[in-house]
Amino acid sequence: MAARKGTDSETEDGGWVLIEADCSEVDSADETSENASNVSDLVDNASIAETQGLSLQLFQQQELTECEEQLQQLKRKFVQSPQSRDLCSLSPQLASISLTPRTSKKVKKQLFATDSGIQSSNEADDSLEGQRQVEPLPGREENGADALFKVRDKRAFLYSKFKSSFGISFTDLTRVYNSDKTCSSDWVVCLYHVSDDRREAGKTLLQDHCEYFFLHSMGFCTLLLLCLFVPKCRNTLFKLCRSLFHISNVQMLADPPKTRSPAVALYWYKKGFASGTFTHGELPSWIAQQTLITHHLAAEKTFDLSEMVQWAYDNDLKDESEIAYKYAALAETDENALAFLKSNNQPKHVKDCATMCRYYKKAEMKRLSMSQWIDERCKATDDGPGDWKEVVKFLRHQGIEFILFLADFKRFLRGRPKKNCLVFWGPPNTGKSMFCMSLLSFLHGVVISYVNSKSHFWLQPLTEGKMGLLDDATRPCWLYIDTYLRNALDGNTFSVDCKHKAPLQLKCPPLLITTNVNVCGDEKFKYLRSRCSFFHFPQEFPLDDNGNPGFQLNDQSWASFFKRFWKHLDLSDPEDGEDGETQRGLRLTARGTTESV
């Protein structure tokens, strides 16, 4: 039988395996393990609990540091740094200086907000820190004037304070004056942080400068409505307020009120009856007209053209621009003028008024004789410096015999045929034009000019006056007169072509002509010699050292001349009324109830 594989376990000791272990000493085993550990240095003999505690503390420190960095970056976005705050307090202009361009970063919408988990734990601390930044410390609150000086936009600060105090915006009551030198008689002023003593004193001091003023105070703001005696600009008004209330310019707002706003007028009217409001003087007209019933009913009056024509006729106004300007200036006192300004057809009304006034004046002039017309002009002339001797002295200075001039002048005024034209000729600078122009100005005559001879209507002004003047007639002008105007110089009826009208037939008014041409010595104009009276002016017109004329020829001088030689000129006596009173002037409007009584 073959032998079995493997060890032979039949023996007691099992072959080479020891059944029992030999005992050894413990110290020798420990030394062997220590020597093996020191040599290899591969095993950490530290306790597991101690190692876990150190790693947890390190992790917490790292998380706290990271959280503080994120919080600091977040604060930089929303909290102004102390350095920039100090810089802005020193000078607001430095805040606008930047080396890098400023771009506004738009915050994008975030669907999922990231949360570190630390913000919730520090929420209480952050809220307390924010409260400490906003709330001022007790006992260190600044007054309103100091806060105004430190704020960047002072005007916006005053606007906000005014609206919070009075419940209405300052710009709702005023209209803007961009220039500080534009004058106005009405001003709305807001004063900030005025002392009570100065405010009470201002109620008395403002009476010397204003015909009406309104003063109301709410908190630190004082509202003023000033209607000054003399219009002032904003700079002058600020200077006045500084002297009265002892405040600076930054504590004041001033703009003129909205005078055409019914809401603003009603605000001032109702505010005048409120408690704590002080007013002085009569209510301004622009407030009364928009609030009081009597003024409101008067403003509803319709425009009456006849009243405007009557006013222009009484003031002897015929120019359209002059009528429009002067009548508009009466809107504050005249109800019809106010209705004229509210009308949408002002140019048409002005044109119609000027046309009707010219028609009435022309008809009145034609109705009067030359004697009556001269008498009317003498009455209308003011009693100023003027003497008839000035006219006589000037004629004698030119070597003209006064008796002969008076005889020809008498026939000239009467319009006698062949004596209807006076010609003053001579060298230049002898006073020919001055003499004739002064007489024409007194009698309100008309001027014709040969420069318009190419037009068919250049003689049309002769239909509008009692006397005409052709100044500085040259040789071509005399040729034209010799060819076409002989019958006009005779004083007979001739035809004048008028614009937009049929040719008009009229008697030529007395005509004055000044010229440098000697018509008497030229045989070519021999047919004009018998139709004109000629006066030669050989002497140069005298002037004093200051360049003033040596003879005062004005309206007063001619009025005195006609009064002095009224009988010598065979002028008829002025026609009076039945009872010796002068005739009543033209009346274009119906009489009122009080006037008829």
UniProtKB/Swiss-Prot annotation:
ATP binds at residues 426-433. HAMAP family: PPV_E1. One of its GO terms (molecular function) is DNA helicase activity. The keyword ATP-binding applies. Residues 119-141, 574-597 are annotated as: Disordered. Its EC number is 5.6.2.4. A motif (Nuclear export signal) lies at residues 90-99. This is Replication protein E1. The modification Phosphoserine is found at residues 81, 91, 104. Pfam families: PPV_E1_C, PPV_E1_DBD, PPV_E1_N. Residues 400-550 form the SF3 helicase domain. It is an enzyme of class 5 (isomerase). ATP-dependent DNA 3'-5' helicase required for initiation of viral DNA replication. It forms a complex with the viral E2 protein. The E1-E2 complex binds to the replication origin which contains binding sites for both proteins. During the initial step, a dimer of E1 interacts with a dimer of protein E2 leading to a complex that binds the viral origin of replication with high specificity. Then, a second dimer of E1 displaces the E2 dimer in an ATP-dependent manner to form the E1 tetramer. InterPro entries: Helicase_SF3_DNA-vir (IPR014015), P-loop_NTPase (IPR027417), PPV_DNA_helicase_E1_C (IPR001177), PPV_DNA_helicase_E1_N (IPR014000), PPV_E1_DBD (IPR046832), PPV_E1_DBD_sf (IPR046935), Rep_E1_papillomaV (IPR016393), Znf_lg_T-Ag_D1_dom_sf (IPR037102).
